Amino acid sequence: MEHKKTMLDYIADCPEFIRNNVADSAALTKPLVDEYVSGGYKNIWIVACGSSSNGSLCARQFIRRHLKCEVKIVTPFHFVSSENDFSETDMVVVVSQSGYSLNALDAIKVIEAKGRRCIGGPLP
């Protein structure tokens, strides 16, 4: 039987993932950087919950300081149900630890339904 990873497994894996992510940071962030630069965006929305939201809160100040733009963080539930009035000058980023959060996938569907491009893996 396959071992299903728990939060403790992810915590134990963190040092290696951090080293790899820092080493590959330019390649990992290139699609988002290219989209931001070419899109003429003025603000960023981050759609995230749980630990993804916590990480996004940490990134928020860094992004604001370096990009000189406003960063709004909203949960997938609120984004899908009511708070999705982003404009053409708002870049919307959905963050999910696993990539399979149903609420996050629903948020992506809202973004795509508004004719916006989504970057990342294909939806299951």
State the predicted function of each range.
Residues M1-G39:
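Cofactor-/ligand-binding subdomain signature composed of acidic, glycine-rich
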Residues A27-K30, V37-P124:
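Glycine-rich phosphate-binding loops that contact phosphosugars or nucleotide phosphates
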